[in-house]
């Protein structure tokens, strides 16, 4: 994401690595200028999925064949699945990815990808030869606010980091706990604007820098993966989920939690997860969910086929309406092709 790319490009460790961060404000001409200026150097593009088209366009305008000139690495590849339900652009470069002569995906928390184009890929698993287990104190509660108050009150640490994927809930926690003046929030640009201009909370940033930290530091999901948080101290780490108030605050113990703990390169002092739970949740197996998607797909393809065969306006209108309301639409990309990432996200 943007914040991770900005941090990498501004990290003194990468001063001589000839990096270019291709994000929203960087245009095709900027990329072309960088390529031409890097004639005797390796080019290293750090690109968001949404800005990948700029790199592609730059190579085309320079009459260079990107797919053989470059190696493509999709870092934090689990995001292809985890973010597919709300970030359509996350898998925009995927069709291009398979055209590269050299290509790979990497993640510390890889998820199974059902796209058949991955079937011939070799999978390399790196397993540490040392124990990397971390103790996590699970606090199950029916009142996440009150439990949060108790947790921060009992902490003796001068640095507390809280991961919670809802800026509205973050603000409510800060306000009701009375820690607004001691807090900083790291979140997306849109949320920064809301906090600063609608809620008059000034310590909100889209880019992480240690000097901006206060005693209480809140992070949304854009900071769950890919970023190095290097501190001189070992903070107390609080992960918070409130599934009844905001469902997208739910944390996956097999990916989100591992990624969050892994952000802190110098370790943490204490880890806790404050959470409640669904009261009416019905478990379904992976096979049951895939069968549901399969039936949606069969029905969608049948309607589309009938639309192609329809010759009168009434039938065509009816079939178009049925296509527009098909549940399978949530599993289509912007070209109306099946998105395996969206299917994997639904299963996950």
Question: Residue ranges of each PLM-predicted region?
Answer:
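Conserved Walker A/P-loop ATP-binding site and its immediately adjacent core
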Residues: 1-27, 49-51, 111-114, 166-168
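Conserved strand-helix element at the start of the C-terminal RecA-like helicase core
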Residues: 1-8, 45-49, 148-178, 183-185
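Conserved two-lobed SF2 helicase motor
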Residues: 38-58, 211-227
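SF2 helicase catalytic motif II
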Residues: 48-52, 58-102
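Interdomain hinge/linker at the junction between the two RecA-like core domains of SF2 helicases
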Residues: 108-154
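Conserved helicase ATPase core of P-loop NTP-dependent helicases/translocases
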Residues: 185, 191-219
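A short beta-strand element within the Helicase C-terminal
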Residues: 229-242
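Conserved SF2 helicase motif VI
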Residues: 244-269
């Amino acid at each position: 994401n943007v914040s991770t790319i900005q941090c990498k490009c501004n990290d003194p460790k990468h001063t001589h690595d000839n990096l270019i961060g291709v994000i929203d404000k960087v245009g095709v001409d900027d990329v072309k200028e960088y390529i031409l200026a890097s004639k005797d150097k390796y080019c290293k593009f750090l690109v968001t999925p949404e800005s990948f088209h700029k790199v592609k366009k730059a190579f085309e305008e320079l009459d260079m064949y990107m797919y053989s000139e470059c190696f493509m690495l999709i870092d934090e590849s689990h995001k292809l699945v985890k973010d597919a339900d709300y970030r359509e652009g996350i898998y925009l470069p995927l069709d291009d990815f398979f055209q590269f002569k050299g290509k790979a995906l990497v993640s510390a928390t890889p998820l199974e990808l059902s796209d058949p184009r991955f079937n011939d890929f070799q999978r390399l698993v790196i397993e540490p030869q040392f124990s990397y287990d971390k103790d996590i104190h699970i606090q199950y509660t029916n009142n996440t606010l009150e439990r949060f108050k108790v947790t921060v009150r009992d902490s003796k640490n001068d640095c507390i980091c809280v991961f919670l994927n809802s800026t509205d809930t973050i603000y409510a926690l800060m306000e009701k706990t009375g820690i607004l003046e001691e807090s900083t929030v790291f979140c997306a640009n849109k949320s920064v604007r809301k906090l600063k201009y609608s809620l008059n909370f000034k310590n909100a940033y889209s880019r992480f820098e240690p000097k901006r930290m206060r005693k209480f530091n809140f992070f949304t999901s854009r900071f769950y993966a890919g970023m190095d948080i290097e501190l001189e101290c070992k903070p107390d780490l609080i992960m918070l989920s409130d599934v009844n108030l905001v469902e997208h605050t739910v944390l996956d113990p097999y990916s989100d939690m591992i990624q969050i703990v892994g952000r802190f390169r110098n370790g943490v002092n204490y880890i806790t997860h404050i959470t409640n739970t669904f009261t009416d949740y019905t478990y379904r197996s992976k096979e049951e969910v895939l069968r549901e998607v399969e039936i949606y797909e069969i029905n969608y393809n049948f309607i589309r086929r009938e639309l192609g065969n329809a010759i009168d306006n009434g039938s065509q209108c009816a079939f178009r309406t049925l296509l527009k309301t098909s549940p399978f639409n949530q599993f289509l990309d912007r070209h109306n092709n099946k998105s395996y990432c969206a299917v994997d996200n639904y299963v996950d």
